[in-house]
């Protein structure tokens, strides 16, 4: 339970101060801070006493499935350049998050009320009745898609010391990633402000709170997201196979198997495409410095040669699996020599529902879609609270 409601607000010169934030145990130590940038501040998620800072970009992508194969390959290649370009910088990790959430669903109805001909009654006309029925049907399944790209820097990768230097490095690297995304034909809407970052966290813990937040924002157009204390759930309970936070239940899965055959750039469309459930797909990328990759592959080649010489000395035959492993190592060396970058990655999927039955139905649908994409999902039993944090814009999920 969050102690924030019982703390109250302290009045200072007639103004109410903000209560101190209290993140849940899995996120203890995470704070939302701000960095000045041009006309407005950028929101930053700070961890480990400010030694790790994360900024979040809101993005939009035109329908990838409608592009021709050449355009798809071009965009993927440019995304690869974003990752490879980060391998020798202060960037520690890059997180990609795509989430669906319940849409308001009444935009078309509001438009109809505002734009209809006053001479035509809203009720009783067969055409309008049919249209309202169609709107009512689609509203129940309408989903909003959001794409967030998190950029995390580590103080140990920044040459200059001091909190200001780390913050400056984060802003610079976030700008560079944004430029790379735009080159990949991704529309970057901008970096989230502190209030918008708090709102993004709040709607991750309780996706069904969006309607209430939208109502508040409509009544107060100058409102910029939420205060930091309101980013976290009022109550959260971890169970063996799910995590409850405020008005939502969540089940988080680890992507434990990726396609083992050649696939098209569209292979994840079955999971990321049209969906009637509330879910989040998050992939954390950790670019590996080229010198480290080169050192590892050279050691592997030396080891393979020593093993082959030893087998020849004792007259042992070479198996097909051993030959394949040696060929893979040589191929890896060739790719590094050509300038390609290696990355570590981990993927997680969080499925949300209003109650147990809703969560069960949503989980079944997501598992079916993942199977079509040749992805193996494993439920994170016994660690749902920590696993849920892996699908937040904190670039978590990989062991340091």
Predicted regions and their residues:
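Extended, folded cores of ATP/NTP-driven motor/assembly subunits in large transport
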Residues: 1-400
């Amino acid at each position: 339970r969050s102690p924030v409601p019982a703390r109250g607000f302290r009045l200072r010169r007639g103004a109410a101060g903000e209560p101190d934030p209290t993140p849940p145990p899995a996120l203890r130590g995470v704070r939302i801070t701000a960095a000045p940038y041009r006309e407005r501040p950028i929101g930053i998620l700070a961890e480990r006493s400010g030694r790790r800072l994360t900024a979040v970009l809101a993005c939009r992508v035109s329908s990838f499935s409608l592009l021709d194969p050449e355009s798809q390959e071009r965009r993927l290649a440019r995304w690869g350049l974003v990752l490879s370009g980060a391998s020798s910088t202060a960037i520690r990790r890059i997180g990609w998050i795509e989430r669906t959430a319940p849409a308001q669903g009444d935009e078309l109805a509001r438009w109809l009320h505002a734009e209809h001909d006053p001479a035509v009654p809203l009720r009783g006309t067969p055409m309008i009745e049919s249209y309202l029925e169609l709107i009512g049907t689609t509203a129940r399944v309408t989903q909003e898609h959001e794409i967030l790209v998190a950029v995390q820097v580590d103080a140990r990768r920044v040459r200059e010391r001091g909190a200001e230097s780390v913050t400056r490095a984060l802003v610079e690297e976030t700008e560079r990633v944004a430029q790379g995304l735009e080159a990949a034909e991704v529309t970057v809407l901008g970096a989230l402000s502190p209030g918008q970052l708090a709102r993004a966290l709040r709607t991750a813990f309780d996706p069904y709170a969006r309607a209430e937040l939208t109502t508040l924002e409509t009544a107060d157009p100058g409102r910029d997201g939420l205060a930091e204390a309101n980013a976290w759930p009022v109550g959260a309970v971890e169970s063996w196979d799910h995590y409850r936070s405020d008005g939502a239940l969540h089940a988080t899965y680890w992507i434990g198997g990726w396609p083992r055959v050649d696939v098209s750039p569209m292979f994840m469309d079955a999971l990321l495409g049209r969906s009637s459930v509330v879910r989040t797909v998050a992939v954390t990328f950790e670019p590996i410095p080229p010198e480290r990759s080169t050192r590892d592959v050279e050691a592997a080649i030396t080891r393979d040669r020593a093993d082959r010489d030893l087998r020849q000395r004792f007259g042992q035959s070479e198996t097909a699996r051993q030959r394949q492993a040696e060929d893979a190592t040589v191929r890896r060396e060739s790719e590094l020599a050509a300038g390609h970058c290696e990355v570590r990655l981990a993927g997680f999927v969080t499925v949300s529902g209003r109650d147990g039955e809703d969560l069960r139905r949503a989980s079944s649908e997501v598992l079916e879609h993942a199977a079509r994409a040749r992805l193996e999902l494993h439920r994170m039993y016994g660690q749902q609270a920590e696993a849920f944090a892996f699908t937040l814009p904190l670039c978590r999920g990989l062991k340091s």
